Amino acid sequence: MKIKYIKTITAFTMLTVLLTGCGNTTKGNESTDQAPSQNQTQNNTEERTDFYYTANESGSISKIDASTNEVVDTITEAEGSPHNIQVSPDGKVVGYTLAAKMQEGQTEHGSMSMNGFAVFYEVDTDKLIKKVGVGEHPAHLVFTEDGKYILVTNSENNNVSVIDAKTYEVTGAATVGEGPHGFRISKDSKFAYVANMGEDTISVVDIENNKEVRKIKVGKTPVTTGITSDGKTLVATVNGENTLAIIDLATYNVEKVSVGKGPAQVYIETDNKYAFVANQGTEEQPSNTVSKIDMTTKKVVTTIETGKGAHGIVVSPDNKYVYVTNIYDGTVSVIDNSTDKVIKTVKVEGEPNGISYR
């Protein structure tokens, strides 16, 4: 989060970089009568529309039609600042983390000490399903592929909340390292790989047992992770070293690839061929690039120019397009993956951070 996360993490790392991971209608937080789980089936035979979402730290969620790259809806959040966002694997639910906003006269640290929420909406109706209380300063939210759980990192509590995806109730928490932030979950839904920004480690969490089973050292200030669909290779952005760590999960050997300045989020294509790293830089010296890394050769094959403060990143399921939030420009860059060129810049509301596609 631009004004919160890194300034808290500086107590651990002395890092000065700031990481911050108009629609046709505006929705508030009015709950539906029934709270469907992400597993419930819909009797809908119409062709599905693809969307991508941005979590805007100024206080909103932008919903963008992927066929037109136009904002079609905006959800306002008066109670806090959305940080990261994800669509469920079945495409029916969108969830995001919501950290409390500072009140007048409140210190930044005081805001950090307030519990936050995980908020869930129906994708097709834009109706609120449930707002779930989690820990202090929630960072990222990820659904398991099997549809059973939703995990949320709580950066001030040094733990991960586990939410039942059917009932939207918190069922437990796993203790991890210091300052947990971004993470991804293995395709088999067994393990979460959590970047601990206050350390130099990735926590491996056994999801079924709510337990950290291993820590992997990767370097100074890891921000988030990605994992190949075969579960063999883990990647982590190492912000304090301007590198992408690539970890062989059979041997836990770590290799590093130099990327741009201040790497934030990373996303791996569904075919595992390339990984894309959004390089944010700092607010004083923002970066504006995406590094495209060949996962076989472990080399950067191209660097793509985006807007200022490239932060969140996602690739469409067909691997044709890459979407990047530019936190200091208030935009999303749409990149043609075949040409490595930006083909569209979409204006959203202030400080877009996380991004997800359905």
Predicted features along the sequence, with ranges:
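N-terminal secretory signal peptides that target proteins for export/translocation
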Residues: 1-3
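Predominantly soluble domains enriched in secretory-pathway, periplasmic, or organellar proteins
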Residues: 7-10, 18-358
